[in-house]
Structures are given as C-alpha cells and as structure tokens.
Amino acid sequence: MLSSKAGPIGIFDSGYGGLTILHGIRQLLPQYDYLYLGDNARAPYGPRSFDVVYEFTRQAVVRLFEMGCHLVVLGCNTASAKALRSIQQLDMPKIDPERRVLGIIRPTAEVIGSLTRSRHVGVLATEGTIKSESYNLEIQKLHPDIQVSGVACPFWVPLVEYNEADSPGADYFVKKRIDEIMRKDPLIDAIILGCTHYPLLMPKILKFLPDGVRVVPQGEYVADSLREYLNRHPQIEQKCSQGASVRYMTTENPEKFKEQAQIFLHEPVEVESITLGNL
C-alpha cells in the first residue's frame, strides 16, 4: 500500500546524468525534499531496446513511489523517449492515478523556438533517443518551421560514467560528433544536449563547437517547467514535502557514486545502495 503522506520529489536516471537535472531543479526550487535514484548498474540505457528501457524505468518509478514520492521526474532522455508514455498511459492508472511521472524532452522542445535564429537545431543524444525521434516529433509539433538534425553519441555516456570526461579520448569522441552534426547541417545555431550526462562534458563540447552555436543543456528549462507544473497542480504540490533535503541512491557502487556526485555538485553527499529487479 502506497503512503498518502507528503514525500520527496523523485528524480530518476540511468546513472549520474540526472544530477544535472537535480542541480537545475534545486537551484530554482530548493525548498522541496528530493530522492535521487541512479541505475548505474545497468547504465547506459541508450543502446537498450524499448522494452528493456521501459521495464527498467517502470521498476525505478514503482520503487520511488514505494519510498514516498508522489511525483517522479525522469531525468533521463532515453527513459523519457522510450518509457514515459507507456508508464503514463498504461501503468499509472493501475499504480495510482493521483501520482505523476514527468519527462524532460517536452520542456526543452517548448523553449527551443526562442533560442534559434536560423531555425536549424541540432540534437546530440544517445542512440535510443535519436532513433525514437522524440525531439524531432516534439519540436515539429510546437515549432513546425524548425529543422532538426540529430546525431547519436554512443561513447559519451561511458566517458562520464567511468570518469573519463577529462581524458584525451574524450577530445576525440566529442570532436568527432560535433564535426558530424555540423557537417550534417552547417546552418545549425543551437544544439540541444539531449542526454543529461552530456553537460558533464561541457568543457570539451565548447572547445570544439563553432563560434555562434549555442549549447542548450536541459537543467534550467526542466526546472522552469516543473515550477510551472506545481503552480498549475496544487494538489500535487501539496504532496511534495518541504525540508530542503536530498537523498541519493544507486544500484551500483555507493562510494564511486559519492565521488562522482561530489565532483559535480561541489558539496558532500551520502549515498545509499538500492537493488532494482532484473530482467
């Protein structure tokens, strides 16, 4: 039986990337409690099938609900692309129709119209997100005049997950994909980082990006969207506890997660171990 008491806002990601979403949300909405769950043991999600990503994501969402969350944000583009709609339409009516699961693709698609002059936009993301064409569909729905080009970056998530973001190898893989997307459409003037891991590669991305091309990370736009959502849905906002606390959980090595999280968040964190079901 799920608790009806107010609880933390859940943030789920396949690994460390969702920390960029959590950081953006906490900057804007510091008063709430948060519960972050990283499925590092099964990362990356990008190459996995729709069915597997859906099942892994569903397991995580259910666990976060069991731990008291009434609202869960999928801080993972692959999960948002491959699992969100199925969970919202098929699972939530059975689990608890009063609880909510939100994704992070639409908030970025909503604002991109104000961030491009050329109306040519690039998306750098995982293989799964690019194949799903979720960004193309959302942007075309909201901004039919924008042309979207996407490139998959299969090695970028492992660079972050294995703490190689500052390595010479990172230079090679980042430059390769930046060059590829600019060849694909030289008129691009805004690039969406369609994976929450990618802002952790920002120094490399900026190093190789042509002048005049804007990088669009998602954190601040997701935070703005979440604030508006809570304002529009007071019945959900009242179920989000306000103690300004954060609890971190990982399915892999808590010590490794702690080290990585502290590097990015610039604050000490305590990390707990958690197990999710396996296929």
What are these regions (language model features)?
Residues 1-279:
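Non-catalytic structural scaffold of enzyme domains
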